Amino acid sequence: MNSKIQKIELNDGHSIPVLGFGTYATEEHLKKKSMESTKIAIDVGFCHIDCSHLYQNEEEIGQAILSKIEDGTVKREDIFYTSKLWSTSHRPELVRPSLENSLRKLNLDYVDLYLIHFPVSLKPGNELLPKDEHGNLIFDTVDLCDTWEAMEKCKDAGLAKSIGVSNFNRRQLEMILNKPGLKYKPVCNQVECHLYLNQSKLLAYCKMNDIVLVAYGALGTQRYKYCINEDTPVLLDDPVLCAMAKKYKRTPALIALRYQLDRGIVALAKSFNEERIRENMQVFDFQLASDDMKILDGLDRNLRYFPADMFKAHPNFPFFDEY
């Protein structure tokens, strides 16, 4: 496979492609769509596929990858596949079985990257969001350092090439980094990051500790009713961004993605639209001038499209801290 996607070296010696394809599909009818769009993404040169147990479409994504291996488009080693440990499996004894369950669904022998999806622990079981009779989430109390040790064992067993975290704040990263007997540092922290939430302080902390920041929601967001405030401004309609797009003769989405790559961030782009999937690959055809990067830095307004409010009552809720 001849992909023009550049890679960044991780702190464990493996490398991650700087542009990834996001596969989150909220509704049932989008599951099949996520399979088709993943095939298209691989066809046009995406080799980094980001998924999760939470998305409930790993079977479809696995089929897409397998079909592209079988038709000779790619080899397994060309693909960088990320999965994530959901909050109902934080207890150490549940970590490996959860990863093995994902691998079975995917029909893969290993994942390239396995992340703790969210630092808030939920009651174990088959329900993704277990609730009591009043509709409140049923939380669990787990020491994330114990969860991390179980993640390290998954790496040692060859089930995951690299391990990292997602949605962790600085304090939570510090807790892992300062853990007595730490065997492997997290290779990355995948967080919401875009022009309206540029995460500059968290990025600086991650760089200082040789942790790659991976951006989800890099293009703002589709409007998922259950998790975002519908009054939030549409990122890709931002006048400064649109003017910049005109200047570079690119789309606002390409400018938003290039902004992240120029900061040393790995960006995830999600689309079910073939034309846009193809277009996102053009991000490697240009660079932004440093003055324009400064202008884009100025768009930050600390705006979260995914505030995850339903987890606020848990002591590990990550977004109360400044970063």
Swiss-Prot record:
GO terms for biological process: cellular response to follicle-stimulating hormone stimulus; cellular response to forskolin; cellular response to gonadotropin-releasing hormone; cellular response to prolactin; cellular response to testosterone stimulus; cellular response to transforming growth factor beta stimulus; female pregnancy; parturition. Gene3D superfamilies: NADP-dependent oxidoreductase domain. NADP(+) binds at residues 20-24, 50, 166-167, 190, 216-221, 270-280. Belongs to the aldo/keto reductase family. InterPro entries: AKR, AKR1C, Aldo/ket_reductase_CS, NADP_OxRdtase_dom, NADP_OxRdtase_dom_sf. Monomer. It catalyses: (17R,20S)-17,20-dihydroxypregn-4-en-3-one + NADP(+) = 17alpha-hydroxyprogesterone + NADPH + H(+); (17R,20S)-17,20-dihydroxypregn-4-en-3-one + NAD(+) = 17alpha-hydroxyprogesterone + NADH + H(+). The lineage of its organism: Eukaryota, Metazoa, Chordata, Craniata, Vertebrata. GO terms for cellular component: cytosol. The record marks 54 as: Important for substrate specificity. The record marks 84 as: Lowers pKa of active site Tyr. This is Aldo-keto reductase family 1 member C18. Signal peptide: none annotated. The keyword NADP applies. Substrate binds at residue 117. PROSITE patterns: ALDOKETO_REDUCTASE_2 (PS00062), ALDOKETO_REDUCTASE_3 (PS00063). GO terms for molecular function: 17-alpha,20-alpha-dihydroxypregn-4-en-3-one dehydrogenase [NAD(P)+] activity; aldose reductase (NADPH) activity. Its EC number is 1.1.-.-, 1.1.1.149. It comes from the Eukaryota.
